Amino acid sequence: MSRPFRLGGIVAGLVLIAFGVGAIVIGLAGRSEVSDTLAQEQIVGSPDMTPALIAVAAKEAGLTVALPTCDVAGKAITNGSDAKCFAEYMRIHALEATGGKTYAQMPQYATADGAGTSDKAKALVDPKTKGPQSNPARQIWISETALGTALQTSYFAASVGLFAIVMGAALMLTGGGFIVLSTGLLGRTGLRRRSDTRAARLAKAAAV
């Protein structure tokens, strides 16, 4: 292998290490930003946000959906994993409030008996707009979805930051490997050349 290729290996290694350092810095900054943003919201898990208690509440509400297995009861939400956990509990709370129905499954308008309807003629009249009154259960679901999506986005952002850190470490190790291999080859080449020069001198001296 020629010397330019060996030097190219060293340069490539240095570039990979530089990219690795950059990726780690960006990843750490991203995770720190997620943590700071969540801390500013001062979100704390409610007392029932444990697997055991939410299972009892879900059973009483007649829910048959998958339940959270994490625990954030009384815990300040300051990282992506806890944000995702909190969002899962929020969804269960919303289902309890809507009788286990999602937004699309609920009637569009409110009725006097609370059952709801999608028929405008049977709906309660909104005193302000004089039109059919919207189903309040749907508003609960909209609020939960908006907040839950924001929390899930925080989890995704934190995961991307972690991925950047891992990739940065991998790039640094790869770059270091290139440098070690290239430096080793250069060292062996130098030794070989010095050995050849010495042998030539000895041969010349012997010939004289």
Segments from the language model and where they lie:
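Residue-level marker of positions within ordered structural domains that often coincide
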Residues: 22, 95, 156
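Residues that form generic nucleotide/phosphate-binding pockets
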Residues: 37, 89, 93, 150, ...
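Hydrophobic secretory-pathway targeting helix
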Residues: 1-34, 173, 190
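Membrane-helix exit/juxtamembrane interface segments
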Residues: 22-55
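Long, solvent-exposed extracytoplasmic domains/loops
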Residues: 45-142
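Juxtamembrane interface at the cytosolic side of transmembrane helices
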Residues: 1-8, 157-208
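Membrane-interface extramembranous regions
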Residues: 25-30, 35-36, 152-160, 188-193
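Short, aromatic-rich amphipathic segments at membrane interfaces
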Residues: 126-171
